[in-house]
């Protein structure tokens, strides 16, 4: 089933704060400082962030991957901020601009989708051919989810500092032997943020340089890492 399918996560279209985290702000301030400034002064952060350029760059890179064949794109959650305004803009943007046809778009929900109202959640089906609210068993040995495996929520890894993400543990897959886990959520820029040779790969847009990656790449990388450990 791998063939030419692609995987990605955490697009965050129409989400100024995340665009600022990716250095698309128009002012010389960090994303967190900018957010604090806007909250303190009661101004909209979007006025200081080039969200449109952020979204267009990502979409342009994604569109280069579609060849008109049967290859699908699996999005492991967080297509927007989760607010109604952001969601509506993101869905329209995907519908209008994404080269992958609707039946080739698969969504595995992240926290920003799981928090949606029922009314807003149903909008996802207008743009995606499949919508999954739990980890996707992509093949016999590949699991795609928004969240890292449950064991990561129980560890002291940097991203889980203060256990602030514990509330999402119920959505995370349980790690099993001889399976590859592809996930997003952490916004790490490292595919192997939790270590090499453990069959866990971050496929978020930050790790993939603002585009998607072939699933086959991670299958091959997993084999390579295992051979290194022999």
Name each model-derived stretch.
Residues 2, 6-8, 13-138:
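Core catalytic region of metal-dependent phosphoesterases/phosphodiesterases
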Residues 123-230:
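Conserved beta-sheet core of the metallophosphoesterase superfamily
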């Amino acid at each position: 089933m791998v063939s030419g399918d692609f995987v990605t996560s955490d697009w965050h279209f129409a989400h100024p704060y995340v665009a600022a985290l990716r250095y698309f702000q128009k002012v010389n301030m960090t994303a967190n400082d900018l957010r604090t400034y806007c909250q303190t002064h009661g101004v909209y952060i979007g006025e200081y962030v080039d969200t449109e350029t952020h979204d267009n760059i990502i979409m342009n890179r994604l569109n280069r991957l579609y060849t008109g064949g049967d290859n699908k794109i699996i999005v492991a959650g967080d297509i927007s901020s989760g607010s109604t305004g952001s969601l509506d803009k993101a869905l329209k943007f995907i519908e209008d601009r994404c080269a992958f046809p609707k039946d080739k778009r698969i969504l595995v929900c992240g926290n920003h989708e799981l928090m949606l109202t029922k009314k807003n959640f149903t909008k996802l089906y207008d743009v995606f051919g499949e919508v999954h609210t739990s980890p996707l068993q992509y093949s016999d040995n590949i699991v795609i989810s928004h969240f890292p495996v449950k064991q990561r929520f129980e560890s002291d890894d940097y991203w889980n500092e203060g256990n602030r993400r514990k509330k999402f543990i119920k959505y995370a897959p349980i790690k099993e032997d001889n399976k590859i886990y592809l996930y997003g959520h952490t916004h790490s820029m490292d595919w192997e943020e939790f270590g090499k040779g453990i069959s866990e790969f971050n496929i978020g847009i930050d790790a993939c340089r603002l585009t998607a990656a072939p699933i086959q790449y991670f299958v091959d990388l997993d084999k390579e890492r295992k051979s290194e450990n022999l």
